[in-house]
Amino acid sequence: MTAEEAPRKFPRVLLEIFIAVALLGLGWYGLSIAQRQRPYLGDPLPRGSEALIPYRVLAAPNIPALGLFLGSVFAGVTGAAWLILRGIHQLFFRPVRASRVWREAILIAVFVLSLAWLQLNQAFSVLLAATIAVALILLEVFLNIRVRDE
């Protein structure tokens, strides 16, 4: 077999794109199921009173529906963030390192998930969100410094 006849290797980026789109779809599907299940136990709310959902969740939580909601948010945000970050890294940070893109996508998903959890428990504040964001950004900066030194 000569060099011209060698089989072409399957591009790894296509596999990563497939995984990111699958995570995005899984998150979207899980969120649609979690929305149909009530995140609280008890009678359904009348239409137009969605503002009462946090109070009902705190009064009688439906743990499987909340777990599905939080897991779906994590999967969907990870997939969406990966697609956006991959494009940004392709434009500005060549060569693109897959581990860095996945790590940043997961950190963004952790940030969004923590904000969703805080909002669900009515403990969300802009100052707390900024503190969490600064902590995660510093973590990413320190990880980039460590990887660069190795």
Segments from the language model and where they lie:
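Alpha-helical transmembrane segments and their helix-start/interface "positive-inside/aromatic belt" motifs
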Residues: 2-22
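Membrane-helix boundary elements
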Residues: 23-76
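Short juxtamembrane and helix-loop transition motifs at transmembrane-helix boundaries
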Residues: 61-68, 85-98
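Non-transmembrane, aqueous-exposed alpha-helical and coiled segments at domain scale
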Residues: 71, 78, 96-97, 103, ...
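Hydrophobic, membrane-inserted alpha-helices
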Residues: 108-117, 133-136
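Membrane-helix boundary connector in multi-pass membrane proteins
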Residues: 114-130
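Juxtamembrane membrane-interface segments at transmembrane alpha-helix termini
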Residues: 139-150
